[in-house]
């Protein structure tokens, strides 16, 4: 259903005279591609760029060395995982999501196996979702590796549905930016979204086999964007349906759960999510013979990553689940 403005002169990637890359050096002032903005109109972490800010406004603990290739996943706790499971709605046009409880229960177990402290919230109104998210953002995540949030609901392009109304995902994830939740700064914040993003169908295409087959120095501190280290994994691409079996759960969630259980401690997360894509793309096809237009349709998940390092869950000692 569903002209340029000048920024501060921070830059990276220039070459020193000997040809080595000096990743921490400054270059001349950069320009944005935004139209008609002025420094006074820019919003930085909830305040205009021209507004005076406290000296420690955007200072947080460094969880890993500046150019580390992997996230630090050896904190005392894995972290908090929130699951928002929507089956019934107050909105007349939205049908109940039979089969979603299978997804929620099995995803909870998969998260727990990775060491997360999991809480499941069923059929929440938007105000309750924001309440739970706000409470999670207020926690001290200093001793946590990361954060995970899963939303299982109806959706359309750009929107998700709570029990009583629609909302945008950024209403949720902005709570966990470095501005509002500094103890998660520099740590992975993972969002898994099972919902339609439109009403288009993917009929797929049949493939036939042819004749032939063809490091820099560490520093004591560094600055990161407040929106860094997020990952959003969606069950389908923008504009398209997302499929769910009323007995077995949704294609995407079941594929995600199987990969987390089988390879969650073996592969890095982006590799794992690539194989989630593979499972959904190859192992599923809609079975709606009574409605030919809907029958034998396909689906492909997609993701948006602002991660800045490799993420591997690895083993977490028992008893260290609490976030």
Swiss-Prot record:
It holds the Pfam family Peptidase_C14. Residues 1-33, 203-215 form a propeptide. Belongs to the peptidase C14A family. Keywords: Apoptosis, Hydrolase, Protease, Thiol protease, Zymogen. CDD domains: CASc. The active site is at residues 154, 196. The lineage of its organism: Eukaryota, Metazoa, Ecdysozoa, Arthropoda, Hexapoda. This is Caspase-1. It comes from the Eukaryota. Heterotetramer that consists of two anti-parallel arranged heterodimers, each one formed by a 22 kDa (p22) and a 13 kDa (p13) subunit. One of its GO terms (cellular component) is neuronal cell body. One of its GO terms (molecular function) is cysteine-type endopeptidase activity.
